[in-house]
């Protein structure tokens, strides 16, 4: 048996806390103004009508309403856009 730990065991053993990213309000849901719709890193989903974008790319509702997702084609890339329609 080895009398010393392998070097791998001292280099491993760390993990970062989860950032809880993702969709917080899905299509068809009612939301209030200021509600967070999506937490994301980068703009994988673009803001549409009545949706604001925070400095960390978080998308939030500007008005009370219903969440809509749509797919848009932009320069050979399919992108998603989220908007809030007045209800």
UniProtKB/Swiss-Prot annotation:
MF GO annotations: structural constituent of ribosome
GO cellular component annotations of the record: cytosolic large ribosomal subunit
PANTHER family, per database record: LARGE RIBOSOMAL SUBUNIT PROTEIN BL27M, RIBOSOMAL PROTEIN L27
Xref: PROSITE patterns: RIBOSOMAL_L27
Record keywords: Ribonucleoprotein, Ribosomal protein
Region (Disordered): 1-26
Organism encoding this protein: Prochlorococcus marinus (strain SARG / CCMP1375 / SS120)
Pfam families (alphabetical): Ribosomal_L27
InterPro entries, alphabetized: Ribosomal_bL27, Ribosomal_bL27_CS
Record has Ribonucleoprotein as a keyword: yes
Gene that encodes the chain: rpmA
Keyword Ribosomal protein applies: yes
Family designation: Belongs to the bacterial ribosomal protein bL27 family.
SUPFAM superfamilies: Ribosomal L27 protein-like
Superkingdom of the organism of origin: Bacteria
The name this protein goes by in its record: Large ribosomal subunit protein bL27
GO terms under biological process: translation
